[in-house]
Amino acid sequence: MQRYLRLILTIMAAIPAGSGAQTPPPAIEGPVYVATYVEVVPTAADEGAALLKQYRDASRKDAGNQRMELVQELGRPSRFAVLAIWQDQKAFELHANKALREKLKPIQAAPFDDRVHSGLAVAAKDALRRSAVVVLTHVDVPPPFKDTTISLLQQLSEASRKEAGNQRFEVQQQASRPNHFTVVELWADKKAYDAHVMAGHTRQFRDKLGPMSGALYDERLYQPLE
């Protein structure tokens, strides 16, 4: 109980007095990484997948697009994520998905959840393979723990890329809330992913992150959609 009380007091101390007004996040320097979470009603999973595939294929032709991938959550096929990289802020802002949102509105179970990031610990962008296990994790810590968490995530990414079966391991930092991160992992198969979970550096990371976490460690598994 005392640990959580100290955590709450630390968060409160980090909030400036009179900080009710929010300022827009600064423009991202370099590539813009976007993770968009989409959820449709369970009975419309196939329709949602078809619309999202059309959107993905069309967006790949847009100027400045460097990645446009579509994945479907394992065990919950009505939930999807779109993973994109745009060359720069201008290319991202010129890209529009209003038409997609209008088409999905009749079947959506929740509003789109867009997470816009800069690349924090990114390496080669391996192509998404059909057999891959895709893992998306949202890491949230209070602002005073941001820098410590960045160091932990960088260490984790470096160690994880050396594991057998790893095809991608990147950390993205949210532009509007720099104490929030998205971790994108690609593993050759479930066996490789399970080995990663059991690895010493992974468990050490979770042990150190736990006391600093501002929310549940949100890790979800997906399959690629062609």
Task: Walk through the language-model features, giving the residues of each.
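Short, well-ordered beta-strand segments in beta-rich or mixed alpha/beta enzyme
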Residues: 31-38, 69-96, 132-140, 170-197
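Short amphipathic alpha-helical segments
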Residues: 42-65, 100-104, 145-168, 201-205
